[in-house]
A protein has these predicted regions:
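Active-site-adjacent loop/helix segments that line or gate small-molecule/cofactor pockets in enzymes
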Residues: 1-36, 78
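Aromatic side chains
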Residues: 20, 25, 41, 48-52, ...
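Active-site and channel-lining beta-strand-loop segments
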Residues: 30-50
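Glycine-rich loop-to-alpha-helix module at the N-terminal edge of alpha/beta enzyme cores
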Residues: 47-87
Length: 87
C-alpha cells in the first residue's frame, strides 16, 4: 500500500512509530515505500542504497523475483502455522 492510499502523512506514520515502537536505533527520515535489488525508494522515487538489508535481503536482494514467486506460491497454500504440525 502506498502512502497516498492511506490518508496519512509521513509525519502521521512517524508519530505512530514513535508512540508504539521501542527506539533501539535512530530511524531514517524517509518513508521506505518500495524496494528493488540493493535499493530502497521513498515516496518520491528517490533511491537509497540499502546498507541495512534485512536477513533475507542480505542474500537475495530486495524483491528478488524468484523469492517473490516462491512466497506467493506458498501463501496461496498456507501462510502461518506453528511448530506442533509438520508442513
Amino acid at each position: 500500500m502506498k502512502l497516498k492510499d492511506t490518508g496519512l502523512t509521513f509525519q502521521d506514520i512517524k508519530d505512530k512509530v514513535n508512540k508504539y515502537m521501542i527506539e533501539t536505533y535512530e530511524r531514517f527520515d524517509f518513508l521506505a515505500e518500495t524496494a528493488d535489488g540493493m535499493y530502497i525508494y521513498d515516496e518520491n522515487g528517490t533511491p537509497y542504497l540499502d546498507f541495512y538489508a534485512g536477513i533475507a535481503v542480505n542474500s537475495a536482494g530486495n524483491c528478488n523475483p524468484k523469492v517473490v514467486a516462491a512466497v506467493k506460491d506458498q501463501v496461496e497454500d498456507i501462510m502461518h502455522t506453528f511448530n506442533v504440525s509438520v508442513q
